[in-house]
Design a protein with these regions (language model features):
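Short periplasmic/luminal acceptor-recognition loop of GT-C membrane glycosyltransferases, typified by
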Residues: 641-686, 712-719
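Membrane-embedded, hydrophobic transmembrane alpha-helices
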Residues: 1-188, 702-703
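Hydrophobic/aromatic-rich transmembrane helices and adjacent perimembrane loops
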Residues: 235, 337-343, 373-376, 381-383, ...
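Membrane-proximal, lumen/periplasm-facing interface regions of secretory-pathway glyco-
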Residues: 221-225, 230-232, 608-654
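Active-site lumenal/periplasmic loops and adjacent helix-entry segments of GT-C-fold
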Residues: 208-299, 304-309, 313, 317, ...
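Membrane-lumen/periplasm interface segments of specific transmembrane helices
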Residues: 397, 425-505
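Signature aromatic-anchored transmembrane alpha helix within multi-pass, membrane-resident enzymes
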Residues: 198-204, 308-315, 361-369, 384-388, ...
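Hydrophobic, aromatic-rich transmembrane alpha-helices
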Residues: 52-63, 284-295, 493-544
Length: 759
């Protein structure tokens, strides 16, 4: 053994973690607003409230004897907290919606499940969610193809679908047609015993507190990207007839694969964003569940005729994932990262189950989930390709090794071959992801001429495949998304920013893995070496697969870190999850306490960073409801109007509303009108990254765009025009030639009416 005593290892890691945490803290304090955020009264209140929650959970877990009473008390306390912060109704509605999608998947797979059923109940639920989500997305796309998908139809259809699915599922359960349980045996014993492992009650209490913290600030964590496109699907995704309508958007972000936005169309309201954010949060819970189950599945073993389920290590893995800001901060954003991560983890979970039991249908489910990830995020192909490559490499190695070493009788081979041939009907499952990919990417193709944009646009242009107006104007193409380009990249400095100190770049700071992941990487390398040399006689197929997977994802992450201009931590959340999973798989159950002790400084540092960071940059928790105005959910629309007293954009909002919410081009950096859910197109989208500056190169091009987009009014802000000469010149030229007239003037803001008849 390389290290005589594990105690020395954990003491060394504790000291290393403490030093690196203090260093990172000092660097954050000197380069960011970290210390100022910590001193803010709202942050202090957050810490006080959650310290009380943490103590309450610890007392319940340690002093209440009956498990059912523990559960009731925790649920009651959580519901009280959620009601205070106005997220209970939105969360419950989303839980019902996600459960309905899971039930829909179960109903669609009912015939298949008569022959094939997952050994893991959690995996079965997650596979159901994948199939149910794909089916819903396909149905909305088909309604759009037949020009039937107005917002009213989508909401009525979704409501009817949820009610019908729940009623049919309950009816089939009463008739005992659907399987009532998984194949997980009844004779299970669990490694976690709160009486013996009292320190685990602290882990559970911290996990619950952190998860509630995210819900407590969910309503106020309204980030720029979510407002820009996540919450505005009713105006930038769904037209009068469906998702394939031309809505006058000019930026790559509006033509990305919109799987998540389609999935949440029915949850989209003008009054509150809580419903969409709660869906992301539920997806984050499913992601944590996938991490938990992956450790469970990978460490299953029989002891004296009983199945040992190592839920202690699984719970630690869930805990580490829940306190990593880069991962869990995605739970309160309308960004697509968390659902993409969920699909990738479901794929990996199915592969782990295949390696455990050697049943072909797990490979099919794994491929279904992996392909599903492509419809949610444009950068998913990079990391999903790495996951797919790892699976292919492992299967090829397995096939070659079996062919070389296997000397079993022919009968057994024949039986296995028959089972494999019988399993080929599972390939029909590929209909769901492939159809969804075609229908979702069809929107991008119809609107742009490319099947996928973002970082891939330059490839199509080099192949001679052009885009439609306004993504191509004359000979000028859309700018696409910035890569690092020819700029020399200092990888060591980027790694330093990502894992130790983000310096002054706030976008890294709010999605930081913190030094916790750095310590876990060091520990993972040590344990991988120990496991490799101490377990020569054990079954190590799963270990081999996870190592291949880890190398593949690490390579993809390094490539992304090198190529991508902006190194947000959320790009690498799959890598972070795999680090956590691998560490928790490689340690022994008896070493869990040592692991938690060694990482204590990093754990508290990660929780501290998490408490003051989110994509919106807000501090504190959602305020209490306004009596007589808010009934169970947060009214973002009215709350925003309340903050605009004396602001010109408040009057602009009322005037545009009186006009019937005409499509308006906004020349301002203020996103108030976007927040208030008006039909707005933004000038910065046209000329910025992902847009096409050629639209404003000539006045004729700009007029052509206004006509194409159906722009009826232009709203300008004086300060913005003073900083953007071209925007100012365009307004002046159009006023001179009579194609624009002033409709209303305020202190710093003006509304102009576009006279399209003059074009």
């Amino acid at each position: 053994m390389f290290i005589k005593s594990k105690r020395y290892l954990y003491v060394s890691l504790f000291v290393f973690g403490l030093i690196i945490s203090l260093y990172s803290l000092v660097m954050l304090g000197s380069n960011t607003y970290f210390f100022g955020d910590l001193k803010d009264p709202m942050t202090i209140r957050l810490f006080a409230e959650h310290f009380l929650l943490f103590i309450s959970f610890c007392l319940i877990l340690n002093f209440v004897k009956k498990n059912n009473i523990k559960l009731y008390l925790i649920v009651f306390l959580s519901m009280l907290y959620l009601s205070l912060h106005q997220v209970l109704i939105a969360l419950m509605l989303n839980i019902v919606y996600v459960v309905a999608l899971i039930m829909l998947g179960e109903l669609l797979l009912i015939k298949l499940r008569a022959e094939y059923i997952e050994e893991s109940y959690v995996c079965r639920l997650l596979n159901n969610f994948v199939i149910g989500s794909l089916s819903y997305i396909i149905s909305i796309c088909l309604l759009s193809a037949f020009k039937l998908a107005s917002i009213r139809v989508v909401k009525l259809y979704s409501f009817g679908l949820v009610i019908s699915v729940i009623l049919i599922y309950v009816w089939l359960r009463m008739l005992k047609i659907t399987p009532l349980r998984s194949l997980r045996p009844d004779n299970c014993i669990y490694s976690l015993d709160f009486k013996k492992d009292k320190y685990m009650s602290v882990v559970v209490a911290l996990t619950l507190s952190v998860l509630l913290l995210q819900l407590g600030r969910l309503n106020i964590a309204i980030d720029y990207d979510s407002v820009r496109y996540g919450f505005r699907s009713l105006f930038v995704l769904l037209g009068d007839f469906g998702i394939y309508d031309t809505l006058g958007t000019v930026n790559d972000v509006y033509v990305y694969p919109k799987g998540l936005e389609i999935l949440t169309l029915a949850l989209n309201t003008r009054g509150s964003f809580s419903f969409i954010l709660s869906f992301s949060y539920v997806c984050a819970l499913l992601t944590l569940l996938a991490v938990y189950e992956m450790v469970i599945v990978s460490r299953l073993k029989k002891v004296e005729g009983k199945v040992l389920i190592d839920n202690k290590r699984a719970l630690v893995a869930l805990f580490f994932a829940a306190i990593t800001p880069a991962i869990i901060n995605m739970a309160i954003s309308a960004k697509t990262d968390i659902i993409t991560l969920l699909m990738q983890l479901i794929s990996i979970l199915n592969m782990c189950l295949y390696i455990r039991v050697r049943k072909l249908y797990y490979i099919v489910f794994s491929l279904v989930s992996l392909l599903s990830s492509l419809i949610y995020k444009p950068t998913a192909p990079l990391f999903s390709f790495a996951v797919g490559c790892a699976a292919v490499i492992y299967l090829c190695l397995e096939f070659c090794l079996k062919k070389y070493y296997k000397k079993e009788n022919v009968k057994k081979e024949n039986i296995e071959n028959k089972k494999s041939k019988k399993s080929f009907k599972l390939i029909a499952l590929m209909f769901y992801p492939l159809t969804a990919i075609v229908l979702v990417f069809a929107r991008t193709y119809i609107l742009t001429g490319h099947i996928i944009t973002s970082v891939y646009s330059s490839i199509w242009y080099k192949l001679g495949i052009g885009t439609h107006f306004p993504y191509t104007v004359d000979e000028y193409n859309s700018a696409g998304v910035n890569l690092a380009g020819d700029v020399k990249v200092d990888m060591a400095y980027r790694l330093y920013q990502l894992f130790i100190a983000p310096t002054k770049e706030e976008h890294i700071y709010i999605a930081s893995p913190t030094v916790l992941l750095l310590v876990l990487i060091v520990l993972g390398i040590i344990y991988a070496i120990i496991y490799r040399y101490e377990n020569k006689d054990r079954e190590r197929s799963l270990y081999k697969y996870l190592m291949i997977l880890f190398i593949a994802v690490t390579t993809a992450s390094a490539l992304g870190l090198y190529m991508i201009h902006q190194i947000d931590g959320n790009y690498f959340i799959l890598f972070f999850c795999l680090v956590i999973i691998n560490v928790c798989l490689l340690i022994e159950s008896d070493d869990v306490k040592g692991l938690l002790t060694a990482t204590t400084p990093c754990i508290f540092f990660a929780i501290t960073v998490l408490s003051v960071t989110n994509w919106a940059g807000v501090k504190g928790l959602t305020p209490a409801p306004i009596a007589g105005r808010e009934f169970g959910f947060y009214n973002h629309h009215d709350r925003k109007l309340d903050t605009l007293e004396g602001n010109d954009f408040r009057e602009v909002y009322y005037d545009l509303t009186k006009l019937g919410d005409p499509r308006t081009l906004l020349m301002s950096d203020d996103n108030t009108l976007l927040h208030l859910c008006l039909d707005i197109r933004v000038y910065a989208d046209v000329v910025g990254s992902g847009g096409n500056v050629a639209i404003v190169k000539t006045l004729d091009n700009f007029k052509r765009y206004l006509k194409f987009a159906g722009i009826e009014y232009i709203c300008t802000e004086e300060n913005y025009l003073a900083e953007h000469d071209r925007a100012k010149n365009i307004i002046e030229f159009m006023l001179e030639d009579g194609s624009l007239e002033e409709y209303k003037s305020y202190k710093d803001v003006r509304i102009y009416r576009v006279k399209a008849e003059q074009f």
